């Protein structure tokens, strides 16, 4: 078989990078596939910290599979086409490893799919290593652990599955790190946003969802102090309005997540704010509102928005 590109979603986070790099290695070792892990964007601060810590080179960034002369791809940490490579509809999807909802996804041919409602795609990839009798190199264990820590906020998010806890402990042992100490330092590395422009900030970890025919952009930034982000509200709103006009979003929802106290502030702009308010049963004041206990876009924001937009 010819070369296969393996990649996570656009605006890649630690799980997208870690799961794709590790799965590309597994596919070579277990099944002899000619795989290369690539990325659909540059690593964010958190992921850059992870790659540097474990001495792993960042995957090269690609925009088109066809431009690489590649006809076949494997997706990790996503399946929705609008979150994937630009020419996803023009290539063959060989396989998917994901832990999200399945939506806006269709293929012409059968494929391999591994979908589990767990805390991270990295958790699934690690189990696949074990199932296939392939040892996980120390640096890849570090990347997989980081993906799990990132997506579950160090196992505190409601997306954390019971099986993620032993996975985290095993990966920490292989990687040679203290789970709690490393995890906290890693998460803190991702909260240093002072050098980011407002446009960069709202695009660090952002995904587009099609909700009842509306293109809704849901972004998330992690911080140790929500007020640090709200202090930049004016410039952030300008950037959001520009994104809405340029990209054609109907609405833009920004989660500002306090990783210390496990709460979020929702900053939202667009044409369906009544639906956003109904989703979370709050009232936006000056375009934002507090959402107690919310840390997960996947479990505590997108499903609620989906229900409200479909009502």
Curated annotation (Swiss-Prot):
Keywords of this entry: Cytoplasm, Hydrolase, Manganese, Metal-binding
Pfam families, sorted: DHH, DHHA2
Binding annotation for Mn(2+) 2: 15, 77, 99, 151
Required cofactor names: Mn(2+)
Domain of life: Bacteria
Cofactor, how bound (note): Binds 2 manganese ions per subunit.
Reaction it catalyzes: diphosphate + H2O = 2 phosphate + H(+)
GO MF entry, a single one: inorganic diphosphate phosphatase activity
Entry similarity comment: Belongs to the PPase class C family.
Compartments where found: Cytoplasm
Annotated GO CC locations: cytoplasm
PANTHER family in alphabetical order: BIFUNCTIONAL OLIGORIBONUCLEASE AND PAP PHOSPHATASE NRNA
Main location: cytoplasm
EC number: 3.6.1.1
NCBIfam families given in the database record: PRK05427.1
Name the UniProt record assigns to this protein: Probable manganese-dependent inorganic pyrophosphatase
Amino-acid biosynthesis found in the keyword field: no
